């Protein structure tokens, strides 16, 4: 009897495993950045069995001091995506997690914006998006593309959605770094890339973008579905609430969720389980 139970459990495990998606590691050669850029990519169950299937795509951006592996390892992306797709909360999709930094912050480029010596936004839209979408049979239009991220990646995804509203159906910003005071001074005697990314976040302020938006820009922003998600004890709380209020004044609809939590993975583990269904509901 016990042997039969073990056999049944093993069979069920094999069945579940066979239905699982996969997270792959890949890279793209960037002429813009002059280097290879790595990324992780989640592909759903059935991706290899049906070579003609096309999928919507989510660009999932990591935070400051992390890299392309953060959502795979700390965020448990394969488990989360498999569960949400299995329950029908999310549609089968391709999830791209590109590298935009690393833990050695003073000597490693971090950030999603163009800076002197680091034209990441140009790389993202001119090289990464077209190559990844062709290779993984994904995206291809506004209605089949979403962007989201946490902290630095939350700010990056927000600004990408603002400046490229014609390319994304939805934006989900988690604990987003949306602006800085611009007051940090460069550390003398070192190649201070922390100063550069802080300066770039201020120069590319998501808050200023809404403040200065003219009628045509507001119309474009209204074509995107927005979700702002931040913990009540997060040090970026005020910036996230301010963005929501600015958007309300311009009558740009956005969802706002303030939940109990801080700027950490405990919070983002819950956020991603809302983010992927949100993107799924807004694909078209």
Where are the predicted features?
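Non-catalytic cap/lid and distal C-terminal segments of serine-dependent acyl enzymes
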Residues: 21-284
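Sec-dependent signal peptide recognition
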Residues: 2-11
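Absolute protein N-terminus
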Residues: 1, 20-21
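Compositionally biased, low-complexity segments enriched in small residues
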Residues: 1-2, 154
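Hydrophobic h-region of N-terminal signal peptides that target proteins for export
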Residues: 10-19
């Amino acid at each position: 009897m016990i042997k039969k139970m073990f056999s049944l459990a093993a069979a069920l495990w094999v069945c579940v495993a066979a239905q699982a998606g996969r997270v792959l590691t890949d890279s793209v050669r960037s002429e813009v950045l002059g280097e290879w850029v790595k990324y992780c990519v989640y592909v759903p169950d059935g991706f290899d069995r049906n070579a003609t299937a096309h999928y919507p795509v989510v660009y999932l951006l990591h935070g400051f001091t992390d890299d392309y592996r953060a959502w795979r390892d700390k965020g448990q992306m394969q488990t989360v995506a498999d569960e949400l797709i299995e329950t029908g909360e999310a549609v089968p999709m391709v999830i791209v997690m590109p590298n935009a930094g690393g833990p050695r912050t003073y000597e490693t480029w971090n950030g999603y914006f163009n800076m002197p010596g680091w034209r990441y936004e140009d790389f993202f839209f001119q090289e990464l998006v077209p190559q990844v979408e062709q290779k993984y049979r994904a995206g291809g239009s506004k209605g089949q593309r979403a962007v989201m991220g946490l902290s630095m990646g939350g700010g990056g995804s927000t600004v990408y959605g603002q400046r490229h509203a014609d390319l994304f159906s939805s934006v989900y910003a988690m604990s987003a770094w949306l602006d800085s005071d611009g007051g940090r001074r460069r550390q003398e005697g070192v190649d201070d890339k922390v100063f550069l990314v802080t300066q770039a976040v201020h120069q590319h302020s998501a808050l200023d973008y809404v403040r200065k938006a003219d009628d045509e820009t507001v119309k474009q922003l209204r074509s995107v579905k927005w979700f702002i998600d931040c913990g009540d004890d997060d040090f970026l709380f005020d910036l996230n609430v301010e963005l929501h209020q600015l958007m309300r004044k311009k009558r740009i609809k956005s969802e706002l969720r303030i939940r109990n939590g801080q700027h950490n993975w405990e919070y983002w583990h819950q956020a991603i389980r809302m983010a992927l269904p949100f993107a799924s509901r807004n694909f078209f």
